[in-house]
Amino acid sequence: MMNFLRRAVSSSKRSELIRIISVATATSGILYASTNPDARTRVSLAIPESVRESLSLLPWQISPGLIHRPEQSLFGNFVFSSRVSPKSEAPINDEKGVSVEASDSSSKPSNGYLGRDTIANAAARIGPAVVNLSVPQGFHGISMGKSIGSGTIIDADGTILTCAHVVVDFQNIRHSSKGRVDVTLQDGRTFEGVVVNADLQSDIALVKIKSKTPLPTAKLGFSSKLRPGDWVIAVGCPLSLQNTVTAGIVSCVDRKSSDLGLGGKHREYLQTDCSINAGNSGGPLVNLDGEVIGVNIMKVLAADGLGFSVPIDSVSKIIEHFKKSGRVIRPWIGLKMVELNNLIVAQLKERDPMFPDVERGVLVPTVIPGSPADRAGFKPGDVVVRFDGKPVIEIMDDRVGKRMQVVVERSNKERVTLEVIPEEANPDM
């Protein structure tokens, strides 16, 4: 190992340096490397402690920070930078332009490397803004316990993002609750909050608290940037255990409600394997930057590692509806729809050879009499292939009262374009 490292210092060729260190670490450590277009190569090398001690004997000008502190990691992190560039950068030791520098990257994901403190740092960023919610329950004035959940403070005015089922009585109140919500912060402060908006269909609600002192807030990220396999953390108060952090990965970025056997409206969730339990509802799903990318909503009771969250991009649209109209306005055209894929299309064509020759789309099995779709000329069996110029129907778009063109395929390869004007959906439908 030491001979390899000495050769690395005397090497002026970037490719040779990478080869030397790669071979040296094959049985002695862990290597990460990346090359960018400006001819800089950065190699991060994790070296066992036994070898680390010997490195201090090499004839290098080693700064005190180069030897990694044992309490930070089981392995020390060394970053070697080979600079093959005409820039006037002063090398540390030799005449060939090769230098050795230190970098403490244990807390940052570098080139796919999850540092020791990465999750802890993300949890520390979001933690102060995560709250415990407690809603007294009763029947005709008789106390019947409390509903427990979690939430996230998203602005300095004291707006808390949570789930509707945590703060709304689904049996007796359909749209919103003006009842009391007890809010407890991570630092122990308690407040009395009020539900200001709730949307039962998406299961998203906003609670408001007032504070004379500054409140911690969380930053909202973008769920559209997520990929299956990305690391995420769930923070909340499962079983009233405040400040609980669990970690996992994104299993699916667009799990459909129909896949979960949930009837009614079309919805999509983020699926993760983070541990989510009773009391986690309403708490944030967070990326490694400490940004909220989802609202934890439910888990599958019959299995472990199947948790679901409302994507923050959808939540942001709901919040905009709340600000603009005080409620979520959804278009309704009066169609029962079934989303098609290749498998379903193949099965339908086996039953009926005249079924439209499409790869994807939305099947219309039912048209509600007297609805906008009925007036526009939709028929049962139509397959919607384009909706207002787009290949899919975007459920959350505010299109009420706007004339739209819908392209449908019918039997015998018939294609027609229909015009429909959506009405506002009844929230109780």
Curated annotation (Swiss-Prot):
Region Disordered: start-end pairs: 87-113
Keywords: Hydrolase, Protease, Serine protease
Hydrolase listed as a keyword: yes
Pfam families from the UniProt entry: PDZ_6, Trypsin_2
EC number of the protein: 3.4.21.-
CDD domains: cpPDZ_AtDEGP14-like
UniProt domain PDZ: residue ranges: 318-424
Entry-linked PANTHER family: PROTEASE DO-LIKE 14-RELATED, SERINE PROTEASE FAMILY S1C HTRA-RELATED
Function text: Putative serine protease.
Family: Belongs to the peptidase S1C family.
Protein's UniProt name: Putative protease Do-like 14
Organism: Arabidopsis thaliana
